[in-house]
Amino acid sequence: MKVMKILHIGQMIGGLDIYIRNSIVYNKVAENEYVIACGEEDKHQPVIKNGTEVQEIPIALYRSLNPFKDLKALIQTVKAIRREKPDVIHCHSAKGGIIGRTAGWITGVKTFYTPHAFSYLCTPSKLKRWVFMTIERLTRFETYVLACSESEQEMAIKEVGYSKEHALVWHNAVPDSSLERGKMVDKSEPYACYIGRPCYQKNPLFLLDVIKKVKDRGCNLKFILLGVGYHSPELDAMKAKMHEFGLEDSIRLEPWINHADCQEFVRKSLFYISTALYEGLPLAIIEAMANGKAIIASDVVGNKDCVRNGENGYLLHLDADAYADKIIQLVNDKELRTSMEKKSRALFLEEFFIENRIKYLQNQYNMVYNLRYGGANLVLLKTNIDNVILVSVGYDTTLHHEERRVAA
């Protein structure tokens, strides 16, 4: 098999940086070559693969809609594709997805799109949701959506209109973060941990309602909220509500810190909390599971793909009293907490440990590569939900049950 060149398109920020970086660094296929087209103002460390820095192409890729910058990014990306001649494009999130899918369509290169939570979920405005949904549908082209969870895959088919043949799935997966060591954390007072920018998606104002309920019931648990920094549109509203509720002594806000220090906070916590309105598949929860933490999370897309209700944590509707009930229960019941911690760790190793999961991402790349070049025989594997997956002969065809839910 000749070298397969894979072009990633997306901002190297936060969870996208982790996803792109891990999918390159932990892929052991020697024949792969990688290029990253990322935002010209992204602040990140270079990706090192086998001792060599992966080539990056800066483009005008920004979060907000800007017709002039977006057109510039598209032109830059098309030029990069024609110059680099990738075999496969893998584009990420809303803006990278629009640019990448359109550029792939223009140049005729097979394209994967991982939404990391569809863009139309990001706003309560019905008009904006309709606009974002329309953009998602208009830029489907012949793209393969590569969802990061089954619930995101289902959404791609039922709401965005992807065919089952073009709706694939590969779970977000991460290294074993329990092995990382950061700065020492003061754990003299027990605390619960939460990671996320103060923004609409992460629902921080509801979290404050929960914390107030917990405090009003006489529970002195502290809360450490990590990731307060880059692009935090609800931070001022959050601080105002903390003051209104008198929660300054109950909450510690931590700015954007390095990954090892962040994981140290998670490791020393009693358990992990998420109040998100939606997710793709949350890396923060997966890393909390790697650290053997019980999870209390909202019952939404993404969260429900990694939390088994009543086993490694709880999935809850957005009801502050229900959250307070489970928080206080886990604070007081060490035996239950320990049981859930063990289950979280086991689920991580089984379903989300990247060294066990990366081969399934490569299988997806191989499938599309071989459809493009026709250079290998393809095997049709029936799945347990009457879908089909194509896998090239000569590669690992023993698919985990989660990957057997996809259609290709």
Question: Where in this protein do the model-derived segments appear?
Answer:
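Nucleotide-activated donor-binding/catalytic signature segment of Leloir-type glycosyltransferases, i.e.
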Residues: 236-257
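N-terminal strand-loop element at the rim of the active site
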Residues: 8-69, 234
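Glycosyltransferase donor-sugar binding loop
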Residues: 37-43, 195, 222-237, 255
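Aromatic "clamp/platform" in nucleotide-sugar-dependent glycosyltransferases that forms part
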Residues: 277
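Donor nucleotide-sugar binding/catalytic pocket of nucleotide-sugar-dependent glycosyltransferases
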Residues: 57-58, 137-180, 194
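Conserved acidic donor-binding segment of nucleotide-sugar-dependent glycosyltransferases
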Residues: 309-310, 314-320, 329-334
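Short hydrophobic beta-strand element within catalytic cores of glycosyltransferases
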Residues: 294-297
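Conserved donor-binding/catalytic core segment of Leloir-type glycosyltransferases
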Residues: 7, 185-211
